[in-house]
């Protein structure tokens, strides 16, 4: 049964008197650090020199190289990209950990797949907001929050659960509610959602729809509007009220087409393919492929990225967005 924790459920402030090092100052890093600081906690930033280092200083934080930040901290939250966490941990974090430190993550990838293997005498926990950093920060300032997940991998001190819940409350997450999970469950469901639906599934669905219309002789501009541009309208309705809200809001023609044609596109074979994707996540095939490609300079990754950048739908989209000044352009030029 799903367990959800709110402000009133966090009885003990296990962060009181502890120093927190937030490693990284990107999307999640700036939000966690600022929310914790606003709640009165002692926060330092660990990061390499660069724009984020300078930005953290401008925001009023004490900023140190990662190793120095870890040395002085009791709780270390690692908020770096998955592909660099392993090296940073090995070279800068692990040598400076002390007994009963707490090592924390917002995504379980490197712990679950064994890239990072903490010593047995430190706590390891997860606090994962289900939204981007800018939303975590904005909702906090507004007095609300983004729902989050939390989980415990190691409880060396006997206080890991209290520390994790206190951390979740510290970033404001318990205002909305935090759901208890495990590193395994968070990692595998997150990767599956990205690959089968949110990123991989949706992008290929849109591309295939665009190609079908263009190959049938329709103008690429109209195809773009029908299968990509208008997606936002549907997703916004879905975000606010689920599929029922979509079907309530669209025309009867569109709703009828949903029922009779959706199953022709997403056939039982698609679900079987989704199961295969999930299996590759569960058995480590995907993580091994990603990790090995990273070691080889991301040759496969960059090749695939370049192929997608050149798709006709991207060229048409860039041109059409120039006609819509109400859209804040986020075109990625190379």
Swiss-Prot record:
The record's annotation in SUPFAM superfamilies points to:
6-phosphogluconate dehydrogenase C-terminal domain-like, NAD(P)-binding Rossmann-fold domains
Where along this sequence does the record place binding of NADP(+)?
A: 25-28, 48, 52, 82-85, 133
Gene Ontology biological-process annotations: isoleucine biosynthetic process; L-valine biosynthetic process
Positions in coiled-coil regions: none
This enzyme catalyses: (2R)-2,3-dihydroxy-3-methylbutanoate + NADP(+) = (2S)-2-acetolactate + NADPH + H(+); (2R,3R)-2,3-dihydroxy-3-methylpentanoate + NADP(+) = (S)-2-ethyl-2-hydroxy-3-oxobutanoate + NADPH + H(+)
Q: Which cofactor does it need?
A: Mg(2+)
- How many cofactors are bound and how? Binds 2 magnesium ions per subunit.
* Listed EC numbers: 1.1.1.86
Q: Where are the transmembrane segments?
A: none
Q: Would you identify the family this protein belongs to, as annotated?
A: Belongs to the ketol-acid reductoisomerase family.
Instruction: Indicate what this protein is called per its UniProt record.
Output: Ketol-acid reductoisomerase (NADP(+))
